[in-house]
């Protein structure tokens, strides 16, 4: 059995809801997964997208072992309470949320999605949808040829036309 396509990102923020992770967890995650014959990679800065991308690319090259990528992050980065359990599972609050956004160079007070992000998402979603739709149509047309009666029943059900013979 080969799990070379399995890549897991592990968020190593060292914080739990109750406080520092060290209060309740002493396991060395890296050594544990290495002992289980996983490829273990580490990203030193979870805010470095390029470093994460490189680790994922390296993980994809491994053909036989699963890959664990330990991503070292600071929970609540940019918040006054970053790195603490005070930002774990609790809202930041308006002012602290604004400060966290500013630390990322994002100067919008309210919830906001930049137009270029929205357009990119829309374009990719439409492309993926068309591809899936075309695959479905091809598959359904093949099904119709082999099972015309059942295909008609499915088409009727999709159209909201039900005929029950009980």
Tell me what each language-model feature is.
Residues 1-127:
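Glycine-rich ThDP/TPP pyrophosphate-binding loop and its adjacent helix/strand module
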Residues 42, 119-166:
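Thiamine diphosphate
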